[in-house]
Amino acid sequence: MSHLKLDTLHVQRSPRGSRRSSRSSGRSSACSSGSISPVPIIPIISISHDGDESESESEIETEPARLFQRRMSIKCTNNLAAIIKEGFLLKHTWSFQRWRRRYFRLKRNMLFYAKDEKCDVFDDIDLSDLCYFECGIKNVNHSFQIITPTRSLVLCAESRREMEDWLGSLKTATAPQRPRGDSFLIEQHDILSNHHHWYATSHARPTYCNVCRDALSGVTSHGLSCEVCKCKVHKRCAAKSIANCKWTTLASVGKDIIEQADGSIIMPHQWMEGNLPVSSMCAVCKKTCGSVLRLQDWRCLWCRATVHVACRPQMAVACPIGPAKLSVVPPTSVHSISTDDAWDVASPKGNFSPLLVFVNSKSGDNQGVKFLRRFKQLLNPAQVFDLISTGPSLGLRLFRHFEMFRILVCSGDGSVGWVLSEIDRFNMHKQCQVAVMPLGTGNDLARVLGWGSSCDDDTHLPQILERYESASTKMLDRWSIMVFEKAIPVPKTPKMSISTEQEAMLTGMVTSANHHLRFIVETNDTQTLISSTRNLCDTVDDLVCRISEHHKDDEQLAVKCDILRQKLNMLLDALQEEEIGAHSGDDLIATIRSLIARSIPVTPGSNAYLLNPNISIEKTEKDQINSKERRNSRSLRSSEKEALQCRANSVKRAIYNVVEHSEPGRPKRYQRKLSITPFEALKLPTNASGESTPCTSPLPIIPPINIISPTMETSRLTCISPLPDTRRDSVDENFFNSINLPAPRQFADSRRSSGVPEVIQEIEEGANGETVYRRSRMSLTGGANIDDAGNRLSPCSDGGENTPTERKVDFLRVPIHTGEPIVDPLCDYRPHEVFEQKENDKEKDKPVEIDMERDTCVEKDGSVPEEKLVHTCNIQVPGVVVTPNPQNVYSSASITIIDTDAQTTTEQSSSDDLGGEASDVLSAISNEECSVASEIFDKQDAGQTVGDIIQNMDASNFTHIDSPETSDETEAMPGESIMDDISSVLGHDITYALQDNTLTDDTTTLCSEHVGPPKPPRKKSLSALSRTQAHPRRRNSSPPRIARLARMDSDDNPQQFGFENIVFEIDNRCDDQKMREPPRYCSLAQFVEGNDIARQSFKQLMLEQHRGEDNDSEYPEHQQTPTNKGANLLATTSEDELSTQTAIKIEIQDIDATVRNLNSSMKPNTILTTSTSPTKKSGHGQDISVVVRPPTPLRGDSIKPTVSLLPVSSGGAMAVSMTCSGMLGVRAMNASEIRRHSSHAPGLAVREFDKDKDRRHSGFNPNQLTLDPEHARFLSSSPAASRRISCGSLFKVKNKKIATKRSYGLFSVRFFVVAEPDFRLATLALIRPLIPLPNEALPNLQTLKGSKSSLFMGSTLFGFDHLASAERDKEEKGGKDKEKTPTEETNRKLPIINPLVRLPNWPNLANGGGFISKCLLANADTLCAAVSPLMDPDETLLAGYHEKCVMNNYFGIGIDAKISLDFHNKREEHPEKCRSRARNYMWYGVLGSKQLLQKTCKNLEQRVQLECDGQRIPLPELQGIVILNIPSFMGGTNFWGSSTKKDDIFLPPSFDDRVLEVVAVFGSVQMAASRLINLQHHRIAQCQSVQINILGDEEIPIQVDGEAWLQPPGMIRILHKNRVQMLCRNRSLELSLKSWQEKQRQHSISIQRDASSTASEHANSTDEVISERECYVLLNFIEAVSSLVKWVKFLIISHPALQHDLYEVACRASEALESIHPQGKLLEGPSLRTKLVEVIDSSRQLYDDACTLLRDRGHSLILREDLETKLSAALANMEMELKKCSVQKCIDGKLRAYFNVLAPNEEVDGRRKSRPFWVRLRSGSTAGQQQFKPPMTNTREAANNWSVNEVVTWLETMQLSEYVDSFLKNDIRGKELLTLGRRDLKDLGVVKVGHVKRILQAIKDLSEN
């Protein structure tokens, strides 16, 4: 540092080593000084170039400066200013073209760089006079150059996006400071400023700098060119150029603005000087302008007109903008940018359709950069955006104020989807139309829209823009890909740091626990069992202690530890039960008991039920009774081993939860080990009996791949939203075992047990300040604490008998028994919630006494168990009096159990008095514990029993606050009750076990009545409690129900209902005790944050109690009429009431029963009496659709009650039903047992279901709710939320002939329209067959129109296929010429399933069980699957889903997505290998061949499940599934196949029909073959919604529109999102416009010719004498005519039968030919052209007549071979020569002949290359060619107006027909032909030098006058 001065230092460049040492010493000195001067010392080092190869100099720079100044600054100095951008770039070196990585830092007007960011010394560059430009033109290496007056750097970025970011940052760093630092304004800096955008390029001709006017240096004129305005400059002059680039806005026009008198602004010309294109012509004088010698003349950047300097003043002021005027946004129309970041636009006059262009600079062959620049040259630069740089949002924001505009996306399908998604975000569907230019690889959407497969040439963009201007509009369906992803554990931040030793110890403990659990489950040795049990308890205790030490303050972990201890106690209980019979009194029992005593949780504060000091619980004798009931149920006949396995798995899951909670950051491999090992270790062998066991893993015969372990994140299961228990085949048994959804924990399970140490207190403050304690509990079914006799044991029981005694509670206090803590089978799922109890609420409680009677439970041995009285604590319960229970009701403080099989003396069967076997309804319901939390009601009658209270829970005493009955303005709804809410929360299996009803869905149940032959009576359920002689009243005639029925029958009390309140109910009992139930209603709940159900959703109503009995509700339950074949009808209301109401009754009969069409009989003023009179023929019968009620509840007097008209079944039983508004009835009359099939509700009679179908419960916890695809949509929704069909009309009055007597499926189904308000018919669904109704009943329905879609079409329940085929046959017979509309055809058929799925090689989903259980007893959603997808899905159906993306083209899962994903990864890894479309296709082929060998997606059918419109589709062995929206897949493959058969069941595919095509992919060979062969066997279905369930725990590749990713397990729903306007190519319109423009052009030419006499006289004077070249063409013409005359005469002589007039024509042509060369000498002067007219006419007539004769008689002529050849050649030559001749009428009125002078030296060769004569004769193309041949002259004006056909003819005459296709493709007309240069010909494919010279010479000859 001795050479360093204080201010500056000038040093000659030293060798590398010495300079390094100098720098290092400088750094050390700077570091040692310790102080920094406030004024930075910036050394300036002047360096000479004497061999330093590290300094960067661009190899492109042709004018390097001799001396560059290098400035260096220290790190602390350049840190003072704000950094605009920094990062690594590659810097080009001078030697060997090398690149070196350097770290750059950009600041205001300064650029610094060094080797890395930690360097202390940076080289700095002053950017005050900066010039920067892109080095490449094809986006090859993303390099750009920076030039300043002192430095020049060539830098390279990793991607074009990064390069453009640096260029934009350089603009920001050098731009002047603006007061507002708005990011949007920064983005608009390029648009609003007129700065040039330079790039380095070379030129083929001399080019001159627009700044210094000197020629660009080098042979190739290398320099910089602006990509917008084509301004040319030297690199050294770029910084000096003025900002006069192409205008963008009105402000950029500046002083050139021209304003008219009326205030309107005219678009002026924007001139650029010099460097004009080849053969430019002055727009004023029509002479050539431009020069290669100097910079002269002007060109307009908008209209592309060129003028001389002298002619420019004569040019029109207004600029016509050019050929793309319709698409250009004139800069004078864009005034400013408004506050909402959109242009303030003033639309120009005339036609205006602005075009917004998005170009992806990376698409396809990397042609995007060329198109980007070309579009900026043709349009306003502010209309063109690079998707890579700015994305679509900027352009859409700017165009927001345009009323209508078009969007052109120049890219592949992925970018099109990106733009469409942004259009969705801005909601601009109605104001924009989208077109696609195929620049990508696949370009499927562009193919379908008609824009071709590729567009690589930007030369003819003006013509391409014209095509987009004439395009037509079509609607493109867009589909939402809704994803419900399974929660997969991800590493989180650890809560405690455990060292490697501690982690190993923790893992060892878990492994040891698993080892001991395995021994406990599998061993039969007592000593091993004792040892393993002790060791397990010690290990668990040690594990809990160690983890608790690190988490003393973690309450959630403490709870999990207590859960683990409780599960361990339950395991010990199970061991005790298992061993107590065989090893009573031995060491094992003693050991287990000691361990139980030792393992009881000792932390009272962590137990939820101990947090409330006033409440504790102990199991009572009721638990033993429940245990016995469960043990006796069919589904729980499992061995103790299986119960023990469940307990062991439960312990393992609890251990996993504890470890996972303590170590959330543990590696994924360890989590996988913990989650998968338990079931692998503890799974027992399959039960040989074939019965479904509740604890084994219910896997199918072929287990799916990578099933998700049920042990994963078990704690999340407590958050499952309340779901019905109905299950479908479409969900995997282990699917979604761990989900985390916002729902109340107490609603997670549908089973609530009584013996639960859990009290959930919810303080309801809505009803007069009264407090209601609601207790709910969940329990596990697994045989825990149950002995061999089926009795439930208490934890400390010694095997003695507990005899319950009768006990009466004559005070209000309900005892809650306390005692030792109870081991609970599902305590880990117990919600640990504590609710504080307010003291003032307790004081407000008013006591009301309750008599609670415990019935005697008689054991099998006759002994009466004794009940042990325990401690009690009293809870004040307001307003309820309970009377003694019936004998079959068991009540406790927390639960009431109704034993439906108990023998009661007061109840007998209403149909049979005989005794019989017991039918356990609880066992029929499920393998779960059926228990319901007791609910306390206000102001009940003292005479009511507990059974009455529970049975009348639907008496509207306790409802949702959203319900209409809670409103002060409305009446209560019939049937709306707490029972419905509880049923949706707890599951219908439990709640309707009390009524012996099983529901088909949580929202849709059909009130049913079953009439069968007499059977032995079963034990009565409580649902028949009040139907016997002792209890004559129905349960709905109890006091609360009486009031309801009184209002229902009154006109003064209209009812309310909404669509969400419609429910269906099916009575599935096999006994003959039938009971008509009123319809169930459900309401919507309110939600609080997190989608939890709000407490205020429940509300008590103070209803007036009516104690009087309603006689109207008494009517016979059955009426046996076995011989009555007529219709027994109920009385009806008046006609005017029925005219405003319609409802539905569905009747299901036996298979053998036939459907009878019943006609309604109108009988007004009849009151609920059975009518036996036969029905009368009503008026005009109409086929009425099913009426679905609107979503909005009705109010007030708009609804009147009515009584439905019900038919009598053919079985003889009269279906008696009273329907109020809102009732839907169904009567099941099949003789066989009908039971809803579910894992929780197996059939009573159909036992074979259990083997194959009862496997939708979870393997480790069958009571825990699992999801299925349809019900998962109800997550986070109201407990009583119903499935709604969106409002829309699907009603249509059908032809009466279609309503035939026909039974469908296994049932006879009849539908009756009964009651519905006519003004609320928002949604209607068509069901066939329909029953005629009188017109007066439906005043408004007949006018509604809609689709013909069937409600059950596509469902497996009813076989409507033959109905559809019958209708199809009928339509074909009725009128074959009549074409059905696509909408009717679509809605009539969908979903269309391929019949091949029913072949033996496709798997059958109907194996095992009966058709009834799988179809009728499935969800109501299945029945409505064909209707609801037609509508927009309700938001509640998609709760829990999120939109992953939007599909426009196709969706693929499996092998195709795997190939796309591999290609994407390859392109990201090696982008240089994927820059060509051909290379991309090659990579696709290679990756597809790779899949042919690897088969990574093999057995995909085991990993996914497919549903189409709600119908499960069986899948064969396949590797992929493709769902098509457009008929093009992965690069133009018609994967669906073309439909050629007339009897094809599928609809023709289209992208605007709202229909998806589902296709199976069997392998890569099929994908390759589908490009060549029309394959159809792989079709699966056509539908309107698709659901795919991904099973297992591995991700599966998925692609949407070519964009692929890995999708985790979950559910995918494809639903219709919206439609967007797309521009399709309209070729017919293009041809019409082209022909019209051609006519206009010809007309203008004729006008100009008539007007310009001087030009015509000049033409006449020059054309009088035939030139030398024309003379040569004339000789060839004479030769051709002579030859043709000769051979035609010879033909006539050889065949005298031919016409002799042809011989005369030949002689006349010969004479005319002789007249132009008398005595062998051609005429001279003007007379020759006049004589030639006669020769041309006669020779043309001879040619035409000869061709006509040969065409007519050629098939019968037998010519000599030589004659045929010579005649063909003569005719061909004659045709070619005639094309060169033209006859024109001159000014003097005479006709003269002219010849086209076209390369006469090679005319003979050209004739030989023409098409064969006979081919032209047979195709008839000769006449067609003649009509397009306009008259031609040798003048430039004529050639300038040539069409494409004439240019092609011109090429053929030059024997250059090989270039015809290229000229046609590029639409080369006469105007373009005259301006073609060498470079243009090269672009057109003319590469041969000789051909180029000939074409250029011919063009020159055409241009000469």
UniProtKB/Swiss-Prot annotation:
It catalyses: a 1,2-diacyl-sn-glycerol + ATP = a 1,2-diacyl-sn-glycero-3-phosphate + ADP + H(+). Residues 1164-1176 have a biased composition (Polar residues). One of its GO terms (biological process) is phospholipase C-activating G protein-coupled receptor signaling pathway. Its main location: cytoplasm. Residues 82-175 form the PH domain. Keywords: ATP-binding, Cytoplasm, Kinase, Metal-binding, Nucleotide-binding, Phosphoprotein, Repeat, Transferase, Zinc, Zinc-finger. Residues 1842-1905 form the SAM domain. Residues 23-37 have a biased composition (Low complexity). Transmembrane segments: none annotated. It holds the Pfam family DAGK_acc. Residues 350-486 form the DAGKc domain. GO terms for molecular function: ATP binding; ATP-dependent diacylglycerol kinase activity; zinc ion binding. A zinc finger (Phorbol-ester/DAG-type) spans 195-245, 268-319. It is found in: Cytoplasm. SMART domains: C1 (SM00109), DAGKa (SM00045), DAGKc (SM00046), PH (SM00233), SAM (SM00454). Residues 1-10 have a biased composition (Basic and acidic residues). It is an enzyme of class 2 (transferase). GO terms for cellular component: cytoplasm; plasma membrane. Belongs to the eukaryotic diacylglycerol kinase family. This is Diacylglycerol kinase eta. It comes from Drosophila simulans. The lineage of its organism: Eukaryota, Metazoa, Ecdysozoa, Arthropoda, Hexapoda.
